[in-house]
Amino acid sequence: SCMKAAPMKEVSIRGQGSLAYPGLWTQGNLETLSGPNDATRGLTSLADTFEHVIEELLDEQQVVQPSKENKDADLYSSRVMLSSQVPLEPPLLFLLEEYKNYLDAANMSMRVRRHSDPARRGELSVCDSISEWVTAAEKKTAVDMSGATVTVLEKVPVPKGQLKQYFYETKCSSKGYAKEGCRGIDKRYWNSQCRTTQSYVRALTMDNKKRVGWRFIRIDTSC
């Protein structure tokens, strides 16, 4: 979203913050989670199949969602994965949350939802963004919840060896409207800027006193 849009005249509005994601962990893919009956559902396209699976998983996910009374849950993200190799696709819970946020915002019936996907209507986002997996070796350091700079450890020890930490980061794209302002904002009357915002994820880190532990650190999560 457009993080800041200020008019050129004596008018001001508040920019909207970014959404963060609950701190849940998962492994696997749609093939391992969707079950054996998906092939017989009679859906006419791969897109409909994908949406159908996501809707089922969202229903099941309600059981393990953090309590609404836990305000800190809004700070945490599901963008971290421990793996022996670079993940080939975005985190499943990230896709679930993105799709759920769209459904909640649209507030539509199931049938209308499938036929009103913004991608199908040719809609464009206000700000262009890019998402990719980043290793701890590329991040090196990060800021924790107390504001201290900590070292992000590249490998996490497990019973059978070590796994690497990967972070799924989203930031504003250097191409397109990132430099020119937010898409859809009238430049004659408003100044706007696309900005990368951050949220917290849990990662294995080391502080300046060489103490190793799991801490919440900030990573890029939206534009």
Curated annotation (Swiss-Prot):
Name of the gene: BDNF
UniProt keyword annotations, A-Z: Cleavage on pair of basic residues, Disulfide bond, Glycoprotein, Growth factor, Secreted, Signal
Cell membrane keyword on record: no
Molecular function terms from GO: growth factor activity; nerve growth factor receptor binding
Organism superkingdom: Eukaryota
Protein's organism: Lichanura trivirgata (Rosy boa)
Cysteine pairs bridged by disulfides in the record: 127-194, 172-223
GO-annotated cellular components: axon; dendrite; extracellular space; synaptic vesicle
Family as reported in the entry's similarity comment: Belongs to the NGF-beta family.
Annotated function: Promotes the survival of neuronal populations that are all located either in the central nervous system or directly connected to it.
Propeptide, residue positions: 6-114
PROSITE patterns membership: NGF_1 (PS00248), NGF_2 (PS50270)
Descriptive protein name: Neurotrophic factor BDNF precursor form
One Pfam family hit: NGF
Gene Ontology biological process terms from the UniProt entry: cell surface receptor protein tyrosine kinase signaling pathway; modulation of chemical synaptic transmission; negative regulation of neuron apoptotic process; nerve development; nerve growth factor signaling pathway; neuron projection morphogenesis
